[in-house]
Amino acid sequence: ALHLWIVPRIGDFRPSLERLATRTMGMPVQIGALQAESTGWAPSFELREIRLLDAQGRPALSLPRVVVAISVRSVLSLNLEQLVLDRPELDVRHTASGQWLVAGLTLGTPGSENSAAADWLFDQREVVVRGGTVRWTSERAHQSTGHHPEDAPALTLTDVDIVLRNALHRHDLRLDATPPTEWGERFVLMGNFHRGLLSSHPGNLKDWRGQAFAHFPRVDVSHLRQHVRLGVDLLSGQGRLRLWSDIAKGEWASGAADLDLQAVSLRLKPELQPLGFQQISGRVSGHQGEHDWSVSTQQLAFVSDQGLTWPGGNVSVKYSQAQGSQHAKGLVQGEQLDLQALRDVALRLPLPEHWHARLNDHAVEGQVRALRLQWEGPADAMQQYQGEIDADQLRIQNVAASNMRGPGLQGAHISAQFSQRGGQLQLKMGQDSWLSWPGLLEEDAVTVQQLQADLRWQLQGQQLNAVQWKAQLSNEDLQGQSQGQWQPLASSQLGMLDLQAQVARADAGKIYRYLPLGLSADVRRYVRDSVRKGRVNGLQIRIKGDLDKVPMAHARDGEFRFAGHLQDVDMAYLPPALLPAGSLPWPTLQGLQGELVFERQ
């Protein structure tokens, strides 16, 4: 019947086809000319000068040539087997409210996501566009960069080839197009989507789920940001880009990007400083939900705008806001990380302000082999947390202007596990290393040639409840080991210390450097001024008791004893600082051999 009855008389059906198309599309349709060709099982029809009219009767879309193929199957379902559009010109706009306008015609009406035209289009088996021109405008993308949506610029794509294939609840799309020269080279977009079994409107994009893919062999991302909603503000960058986007309910839910870009600058949130890279390559993935977000990298290598090099480590950050009775949650994981580069990047990530303050207060360098931190509650008052870190060539220095400066170190390898209940740490240091703990020793920093230490601690709430350690230290001044524990006392400001230390050798003239500030200033000055040079061997140190009572004047207060063998020691028994003004100096004792004991006072 198709070949013998319809094909020879196709011209007679033009008015009927116009009425059918008008009823199906939901807008007036005019067909200038119609002819048919009978080839094979599926006859084809060529339509020329097709016009779709808007509500005012003006042409909203003109198609110079359209080829339509039908079959018995398509006729029975009132659809087309194939629809081919040659050299069409289309205006496509994605409005700030999320509506789609094609040639000024709305796919869907206000308050409804359904559109007869969209349903018809996505119900055809195959739609092909050849050599078209598309003017693409995204108000939503323009609005996401902080501009007024009505000022969104149009991107004109030429030589546009599109293939759309629709099956039951499935839609596959491919678009190849050439952008303006300054924008980049010809690119490809692909999408594979499906709808739920209960979806009755193919054109309702809110029912669509699936994945979209884009490949840009050469692109200037500063132009891309005006036309594609990326979830981040890409300020500049040129190079090669591949994008994957997961679509849920017709909206971007998550995605990934393979990068090979130069001169990149992006801003993750308006209040943050831009992230800048001289060069960056690898994969970046992200997710932005209503109450959560995540960022991760795979084999990402870059040179920052400050010249810092990241050779290719992996890191991921996840954060969920508090909702009702559910606490905020966070997770940071990483491996093969450069800490200095990571700190620079982290200051530009949307992390809690408390974290930014901590990072600004510390200079950090080193390589992290593995890192994991998981927590619940506000980041500045974590209710539960646990983590572990394995780092090498570590340097941490407090650079805060505040007088409350914390400990620091350089040239360390650490392995630590910790939680809100406590933790443990293994520390190793070698040549040209140093330790710093302002407020603990006479001098801020202690140089290290070799150090091994095991440290354990317990926490009760936000308070340190107990500390235990074992350590071996060697440097130019001394070689020795110590073990002990510390715990707080309600009646003491400095707490209770139980320390045993053995110093195999020590430079007698440098001992004052290692005296704790818990000792009175008079004692520390006396040791510094009186012991000029010499060696101390077999030094035994014992401190036990309330540190507020050092040097333990009474036996009931505890123990305080330093005892060792002296060799070739020069000592000013009464240093000038202790003599009355104008007094003659006491003779210096030289070449002393014997035993020196400091016990209590």
Residue ranges and their predicted role:
Residues 27-28, 44, 48-166, 182, ...:
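Secondary-structure transition motifs
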Residues 72, 106-228, 235-240, 246-248, ...:
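Elongated, acidic membrane-bridging lipid-handling scaffolds
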Residues 80-82, 124-126, 207-211, 252-256, ...:
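Outer-membrane beta-barrel architecture
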Residues 84, 91, 258, 263-296, ...:
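Outer-membrane beta-barrel translocator/pore domains, especially the C-terminal barrels
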